[in-house]
Amino acid sequence: MSERSPEEIDRLYRYWRTRVMYSMTTGYALYYFTRKNISMAAKPIADEFGFTNTQWGLVLSVSTIVYAFSKFFSGLIGDRANPRYLMAGGLLLSALVNLMFGFGAGLGFFIACWALNNLFQGAGSPPCFRLLTHWFSPREIGRAWGVWNASHQIGGAVIALWAGWLVTHYGWRAAFWAPALLCIVGSFWLFNRLTDSPEAMGLPPVEVYKEGAPAVRNHSGPGASFWGLFREHILTNPWVWVVSVANFFIYIVRIGILDWAPKYLVEAKGFTLKDAGFALSAFELSGIFGALAAGWISDRMGGRRGPVSVMFMLLLIASVGILFFVPAGQRLVMAAVFTAMGFFVYGPQMLVAVAAADFATKHASASAVGLTGLLGYLGATVCGVGTGLLVDHYGWNGALWLYSSSAVIGCALLAATWSKVRVH
């Protein structure tokens, strides 16, 4: 490393940062192909087997609990593991389970199989957190995270359209088989493309490469004990816990829309399944711009994620509230509302992860973001069976009250971080 000229180091950094970014963004979008395909298949599966909303919510909630803990423990592993093995391996195993799901029948099978799928899905994002914090300096990470975060929306939008088309023309089982085959191929491509930290490639740490970036404290470096890092930067760090609890409520809104929107739009608003897929794609695609805008604005504000998150959450509350007043048949209006909700929910969803990484430093970043994911998907668990129960007993407005009140609580928690900036 010491023999390389500054020009050579700069060239290699630019090459590897570009390769890491497009690889993990594409890779995580593929993860969505074998996780969110179930949303478009929900109604035909429920119709074929006679499931109630509560029973289908159980499929979603059990799998979400598994995903929450898988993501957390994968985060603990991700701070020490090579990202290429963890991310590519998880995608391959998830794809194989999707193939199996397509042959299934019965509530018990669907619960067990989708829970297994979500166990492997938890390996998708923690490697990305490690790569982001090791390849991009704190001054760049808001924008870099926003670019990577587009993988959520790209994957979600594409699978909503593709799975909707597959269900319409070939039946719900095709919505699991076709994405699975693509992701099997994608897992080997991902293994080839990904790398580890700059130091593993013979390059200096990003703090050294980017002039003016803060140095990491020596006692928190890679050689520090796992328990020491976890205790200092996560367990006793109140700010990581605040944003993690806020994520619990943000995910009730986000996952509620992702998992239940197709069913809601068809049953309550008179949409076809194909039109519902377009509305969900609008939600996802607008989220790309919401996350990019939130990251750029917060970087311009010196790393203050709190004010930007609160602004977005207030507008999210207003957007969800509009759903109460839109009559059935107003497809363009509903598409506009879904576009607004996507923009405003994905901004704070992304900033929560960035803030947790900021507060925990890069050597505990995957663990910290894993904690936000754990709390977030516990919220999604509440949303799964909770939405089903509310819809069965109070209609779809009951679910909207759950989402709007959750957005209010999440906004209040993020307001507590208003003046908090990253830890150097």
Where are these regions (language model features)?
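Juxtamembrane intracellular "pre-TM" segments in multi-pass secondary transporters
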Residues: R4-R14, M201-V242
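Conserved MFS/SLC helix-loop-helix module at the cytosolic interface between two early adjacent transmembrane helices
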Residues: F69-G108
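Helix-loop-helix hairpin linking two adjacent transmembrane segments in secondary transporters
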Residues: W148-E199
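Cytoplasmic helix-loop-helix junction between adjacent transmembrane helices
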Residues: C113-I154
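C-terminal transmembrane helical hairpin of 12-TM major facilitator-type secondary transporters
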Residues: R304-A355
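Extracytoplasmic gate region of multi-pass secondary transporters
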Residues: I38-M40, T236-L292, Q349, C383-G384
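Helix-breaking motifs and short loop linkers at transmembrane-helix boundaries and internal kinks
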Residues: G50, N82, F103-G108, F120, ...
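Cytoplasmic membrane-interface "Motif A"-like loop-to-helix N-cap segments
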Residues: R80-L91, D299-M313
